[in-house]
Curated annotation (Swiss-Prot):
GO terms for cellular component: DNA-directed RNA polymerase complex. RNAP is composed of a core of 2 alpha, a beta and a beta' subunits. The core is associated with a delta subunit and one of several sigma factors. This is Probable DNA-directed RNA polymerase subunit delta. It comes from Lactiplantibacillus plantarum (strain ATCC BAA-793 / NCIMB 8826 / WCFS1). The keyword Cytoplasm does not apply. Pfam families: HARE-HTH.
Length: 199
């Protein structure tokens, strides 16, 4: 295989990525990784041992280099062949082919599985026999409890708030009696004294 763009250059100075790019450009179609590696090896004249040593780095460089694109199934092509919008379509299209081969599962509805067996089926549209029960007796009991609760509150209605106010005005002579009351005039005097000292 001859690559015209490398005429006059030493093959030992060429990188595997440069050669792979030139091979894909000349080939014009996607290639499997193994075929691409074999083509690079045959062009550079490298031994199997030398290629095996550099194989992992070559694969990493293919992934990192922005000019290559993996199309799935270890097929590689040049990114320049695919416009930006069609990249996802080209990559995803191979997955769609595999999905068509698989038979689709049938959906099972758990409620309709045994439609012929009516013993276990609950019909929620039927009237419930408890709906016909008379609940008027329960309403009478609620009325009685309301009357007893209101009678408890009636006892509190006679309590007057004025009795508490008188008790609050007369304080026992404890700690409160020992406190002195401050007047506004006393506060002003303290501030005036501080102002005089700072001058």
């Amino acid at each position: 295989m001859e690559l015209k763009q490398f005429d006059g250059q030493k093959k030992s100075e060429l990188s595997l990525i440069e050669v792979a790019h030139a091979i894909l450009s000349q080939h014009g179609d996607v290639m499997a990784f193994a075929d691409l590696t074999n083509a690079v090896q045959s062009y550079l004249g490298k031994s199997d041992e030398e290629i095996r040593e550099r194989l992992s780095q070559f694969y990493t460089d293919l992934n990192i280099d922005g000019s290559f694109i993996s199309l799935g199934d270890n097929m590689w092509g040049l990114r320049a062949w695919y416009p930006f919008e069609s990249i996802d379509e080209a990559v995803i299209h191979t997955d769609d082919d595999e999905d068509e081969d698989r038979p689709k599962r049938k959906k099972v509805n758990a409620f309709l599985a045994d439609a012929g067996d009516d013993d276990d089926v609950i019909d929620y549209d039927d009237d419930d026999p408890e709906d016909d029960d008379n609940y008027d007796d329960d309403d009478d009991q609620d009325d009685d409890t309301d009357d007893s609760a209101s009678s408890k509150y009636d006892e509190l209605a006679g309590v007057d708030d004025t009795d508490d106010d008188v008790a609050d005005e007369t304080l026992p002579d404890g700690i409160e009696g020992q406190l002195s009351e401050l007047n506004d005039d006393d506060d002003d005097d303290d501030y005036d004294d501080e102002d005089d000292e700072s001058k």
